[in-house]
Amino acid sequence: NFDNNWQIGFGQTKLPGNRQRVVSSSEMQFAERSVVNNTFNIDRDFGFQGWYRNTIEGVGLNLRAAISNGDGRNPISTSGARAGGFCYTGRAEILPFGAFTGGGDYFEGDVLREKTPKLSVGATYSVNSRMRRTMGQLGPELYTPTANSNNQLISTNTLLADALLKYSGLALYGEYAMRDSKNNPVTKSANVDDRFVFLGTGILAQASYCFPSM
């Protein structure tokens, strides 16, 4: 930490992706994360990260950026036709009504029953260059280009946007996810199933209420 506003880190950890992925599994509203999260999240990776946090005239601002290897946990070999790619990720969050009680913007239910409305709106953009896995940091390895195949080196752009509102026990949460690519997402190998990058869009919405007696 440089001061109360700046922080840098190096190693393997969660990327600054969609909020539901970053929230701990013990602090979710429901028993499991959504299908949208499972398909489009950017999970963990190895690299550098930087954080900036500040409050300006009562409005909270959180900025995060990361440069990572793009292969996720337990990365596969970096040699061969798919070597050399990196993942570049940035996230911004604005809290127009100020900070949540007890860091409540990163647990889903309003268990602390906010006395005034609290809102956090965030967006992440991530570019994964020369992906090796079907979901970037997750999934099985893609087949590599060869002289006898039409397989391409695949790079993707992922947009993740979310919003969390809490007030007096009520918690409303929504997410939008999109992943696209200019490359052919399908890779092939003789006599085995195709492997392809998951592209497309997804939306999730959820709500909960914590009674005062809880």
Positions of PLM-derived features:
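Detector for outer-membrane/organellar transmembrane beta-barrel domains
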Residues: 93-214
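Outer membrane beta-barrel
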Residues: 1-73, 79-99, 117-120, 125-127, ...
